[in-house]
Amino acid sequence: MSNPKVFEFAKEIGMTPLALMDKIREWHLPVKSHMAELEPEVLEQIKIKLSGGEKSGDEAKPKKTAARKAAPKKAAVAAPVPEADASSAAAKTPVIRRKKDEVPAEAPKAKVVAKPEGEVEEAAAAPKTTRVVVKKPAVKAEAEEVEETPEVEAAAPVEEKAPVKAAVKEEAPAPVEKPEPVVAKEVPAAPVAAAPEAPAPQARKKEVVVGTSGVSSSATPASAPKRNIIGRMDLSRVQSQAPQRPQGERPAGGFTPRAGGEQRGASASFTGQRPGGFNRPAGGAPTRNIRTGFVAANQPPEPIVETGADRGGRDFDKRKRTFGPSAPAAGPAAAGRGAGEKEEVVVSFNAVEFRKREMVFQPKKKKGLLDRDAMKTQITTPSAHKRVVKVNNTMKLSDLAMEMGLKAPQLVRELMKQGVMANMNMDLDFDTIALIVPEFGWEAQNVFKTADEVAEQTAFGDLDAAPVTRPPVVTVMGHVDHGKTSLLDAIRNADVAKGEAGGITQHIGAYSVKIEDGSLITFLDTPGHEAFTAMRARGANATDIAIIVVAADDGMMPQTQEAINHAKAAGVPIIVAVNKIDKPGANPERIKQQLTELEIVPEEWGGSTIFCEVSALKKTGITELLEQIKLVAEVAELKANPKRSGTGLVIEAKMEKGKGPVATLLVKDGTVEVGQYIVAGTMKGRVRSLTNDRGERVQSAGPGIPVEVLGLEAVPAAGDKFDIVKDEVTATKVSELRKEQAEKAAATPAAKLSLDEVFAKVKAGDVKELAIVLKADVHGSLEAINGMLAKLSTPEVKARVIHSAVGGINEGDIVLANTAKGIVLGFNVRPDLGAQAKAKQMGVDVRTYSIVYELIDQMKAAMGGLLSPDIVEEVLGRAEVRNVFTVPKVGTIAGCFVIDGKVQRNASIRLLRENKIVYEGKIASLKRFKDDAKEVASGYECGIGIENYNDVKVGDQMEAFVKKEVARELEGGAN
């Protein structure tokens, strides 16, 4: 036969599984739940402990019972009597006196009729349950015997009420089988004498309240916990249960005997003298101990069997979560307590906690009742750091909605509120996204990175190393006949290593010179200024210092002026080298005066431009020129970090036979080494060799050093930026990003300013200055046109000639005009094929003229378009209001007679009352009779409705007028 389970054994011994599990836990036995099987050893221990506890309990019971009853056997069983006895022995409390008055001599007999063991145990457990519920103490097994005495005291008042309640009706249906406890020990006559001294029922009512709180301190709820003493069980009679409560006469004291024991109502035998207390349980419904599940001692034994409605000893309304009437009456003690005690017991219970304890014995589905609120769907909002939309410059609207967890129409509606008509497939830029996502509690983050940013992030080496001074990069510009090449040769001969450099051909358009103090200066040779202009167009400064070479005998030439304009556009400091001062006709002062016209003022005249007088032929003034270059470089504080990966600019590039793409690089920062991966513009590759300006192979090149590089996959463009990257993957990524950006720029080219678009541009306030590149056939025409254009300038609009020269229109002019967002004007000259192609590619407007006044007139009209037009008001006519009509859903219509001029449908209207302006608006309707009219002439009648205005009175006058924009003309002219 299999081992019995806990709940099966509990049923056998007449206990609830919960009560038995509590005992097992107190005894620290290895049993986990009520469904666990009990091993024979464990079962034997439980039986022994239950038997031992019952004996000890019985010993206490006879003491009090014997004192109160004549039959010692029955007295031994009655546990409540010892409680009263102990309390009376300690101090004769009002409870004892009350009992004396309340219970006559028959009371002991009623007690003798004590209930079976099960009932006695439950009666003893009831008071303990009340205290346990209120205090919820942690019970220890070893406290069981120690707490016996307090329980006796606490049970005393219970005992007094118990006989009143049920002693008469209980005639010992199951004779007590525990006569063995020593009755002589506590048979003192004190309890017997105390019984007759019990006060009247009313006194008892008061004393019940006092007694429950005034019994010995150990009996109060605040005393040591008594949950250890559950009850006493007779294992030899586990299965025996009284079939029904016997009927008998009740002693006087509040209850009257009545028939039908099991059908006894809660208050059928309740008299008016009975003290108020908890509601009595219905007849037949057992009053169980709330903590242990035992049946109270004053109830018949049958209720030990649980019913579906009385699970755990409680009538519990599951919907309202309230306790039924049987819950408070946990035992005789509870039945005899006052209303205040009732409230304390009820309040001490937590319905939810009670259910949690009970859920052990309930079906699984009921567990959800406790977590019903927790099971509700909660609307969660992502935390702030998760509500971030990462945008790669642009994002499709549908993708944005999906990213934010929204519906696309929600974003469309929000965009419409912002005045943007959108659809699901529309690409939104970052600015638009950043405008709408905050409306939904999100934040936009642009994760787009340009190729330069990617290259910068992938830079390697010691990026935090202290920067060191780098050689300055100097560009020499000027007219070809002014000794530029001779000056470069003189500077090269001034090199410390002049013996080596003198006979070596310059391989590239850049070279380094070491001066006397050991520092280096890098010079760039840019014939035609092509590379320099390309660099400026890309927004990069190719050089740190610009040297303008001017011949002292020739003075300023057109190409000299062009070079100065390029240097100014690049924003680099300028040093003017006046060459050929050894010639007889040299006049440096005249050159200084000519350059002041271009805002190049020498230092001795109060300006900021350095002038150096040199002779490339006799090599005079070269040292002073180099010192001035060094001084300007020191002021600029040119520094770089040689310990990081290299970066710089492409000076020039070409395709050579046997070598492939060859690029001349100028390292601006870091170091370039052989074997590294390089990205120059959109071209990538690996550095196969480095050659310096003397044609020598080198392994590395630091900041400010020009080198020739082999290994690129194609020829890059002059002025492109180059970067050294860590690996080929990064090089490919940077190259592809730059190609994508170039394709996007080509697909949507920036709108260039043409002469026809000047007016529209300035209307929007984008342009207030007209940049012009002017070319003419002769110098006289050039001066005349320059003077006329200067006269056209006004404080509001200005014609700025950024470059003017004699000769045809070339590619350099187109690039310069493109950079300045201007136009090119040619007088008696034509652009060459290269310039035409360049102008078409860049979108630069080129205009050529043969008559000077035609050129001036068109420029005057274009600049006049830059002026904001004048607003002129023209009065059309006047009408007098002779009648007023109110038309439903239309408003007020004024019946008018046109007394002057005419009234037009699209004109504005001004309402005059006594020649004072009352309202000014637009005509909403103009009718003659019932027909709409475009205009009504003088002498005719008409109906006029004013838009959004109805306060028209007879006698008012209406003035029709229109506003016209009149283009302004420049006050200056070419007269």
From Swiss-Prot:
Give the span(s) annotated as G3: 525-528
Q: Where is this region: G1?
A: 478-485
| Classification via InterPro entries | EF-G-like_DII, EFTu-like_2, IF2_II, IF2_N, P-loop_NTPase, Small_GTP-bd, T_Tr_GTP-bd_dom, TF_IF2_bacterial-like
Question: Where do the segments described as G2 lie?
Answer: 503-507
**Residues holding GTP:** 478-485, 525-529, 579-582
Gene3D superfamilies, A to Z = 1.10.10.2480, P-loop containing nucleotide triphosphate hydrolases, Translation factors, Translation initiation factor IF- 2, domain 3
The record's function comment reads:
One of the essential components for the initiation of protein synthesis. Protects formylmethionyl-tRNA from spontaneous hydrolysis and promotes its binding to the 30S ribosomal subunits. Also involved in the hydrolysis of GTP during the formation of the 70S ribosomal complex.
Tell me which PANTHER family the record gives: TR-TYPE G DOMAIN-CONTAINING PROTEIN, TRANSLATION INITIATION FACTOR IF-2-RELATED
Per its record, how is this protein called by name? Translation initiation factor IF-2
Identify the species of origin: Bdellovibrio bacteriovorus (strain ATCC 15356 / DSM 50701 / NCIMB 9529 / HD100)
Gene, per the UniProt record: infB
